[in-house]
Curated annotation (Swiss-Prot):
The gene is secY. Coiled coil: none annotated. This is Protein translocase subunit SecY. The keyword Magnesium does not apply. Belongs to the SecY/SEC61-alpha family. It comes from Rickettsia felis (strain ATCC VR-1525 / URRWXCal2). Keywords: Cell inner membrane, Cell membrane, Membrane, Protein transport, Translocation, Transmembrane, Transmembrane helix, Transport. One of its GO terms (biological process) is intracellular protein transmembrane transport.
Amino acid sequence: MGQNFSKKSGNDLVSRIVFTILILIVCRFGSFIPIPGIDSIALSSVAEKNQSGILGMFNMLSGGSLGRMSIFALAIMPYITASIIIQLMSVAYKPLENLKKEGEVGKRKVNQLSRYLTVLLASFQAYGVAISLESIVTNTGPVVILAGFFFRVTTVITLVVGTMLLMWLGEQITQRGIGNGTSLIIFIGIISGVPSAIISMFELSRKGALSPLIALAVCIGVVVLIAIIIFFEKAQRKLLVQYPKRQVGNKIYGGEATHMPLKLNTSGVIPPIFASSILLFPATLANFSNSNSETMGMLTYYLGHGKPVYILLYVALIMFFSFFYTAIVFNSEETANNLRKYGAYIPGKRPGKNTSDYFDYILTRLTVIGGIYLSVICVIPELLMNKYVISLSLGGTSFLIVVNVVLDTMTQIQTYLFSSKYEGLMKKVKLKN
């Protein structure tokens, strides 16, 4: 009986993994279907010109969909942005915060709000893309074959439907597959660009444009970078939590001590993504609109990759968003109240405000270290990419996302296997009884 259960749970895990892989293949297939009315030759020259801007970063996150202007050009970014906005609003807007506390029903309503906001954001972004494409004229001609109202409408509908389809596919992976669907879609997009980035680097080395020693150093650096990211992402501060003893009849229960883990990098990959988006927007706007404005020219120059102003602002924004997002993810006051509700306490700290202040003190120190770690991981590859023409797919932000998704998926697989074994053990105990 135990063997049959183990075999059944193993087959279930395999079916989940196969389902996830099939959905990701569909996502990759869709990234090669272009939107109607685009001159692919003219578009490719524009994509090459904007490889280092925010366009390049979003193109990397979308697995090249934006550069090819496919139906998945907006990727799943509008959904992520909408989810973050709803999360921010739930902190500032009391009715939304109360809605989140209503259990499964409240969660479904919040998710529905995220979907509505996704449609709105995707519509605005799609219209902006359509207008921008119509304004671009290259040496080979305009990017849009037949500009006008019909092109704008079809582009908006196509891109919004593409984003919503990706969102739905991501939800299917989360529910019926393994891992977080949204993260895995971004993950597969980044991974798809790594082989071409490596081939391009060795091609430059073969032609003499890049030293073979530098190419080898980059490969070794990537391995070291991954090891550093794994170390810091797994690092955590464990706080001792004590539960009081309870007497029921003649027996005494409880009194055990557990640990509350606080991650060193609580904010994850959000700070670098937000910081890059803000800093690279002016340069990308100038490239997209073919603007010759002196102000735009200065912004493009000073906010270019590797420039001192860019690096300083980049680090400052990463630190800011590290603190900002950590405050959203971990609510010290709410956690302290929950501990008090269950009778738990931190040894040496009074329940309530004293415990909340202690959490803030620990989190502040952890966030400073986490922010410095994110800054170093993102800035050093940034400087190298600026000097040695290396693809964004080999940058710090991309590896942060990839490593985080792999670690999260592996944890889910381990949890699934452990829970399956536990259920099998409980069934054996019931049969014996």
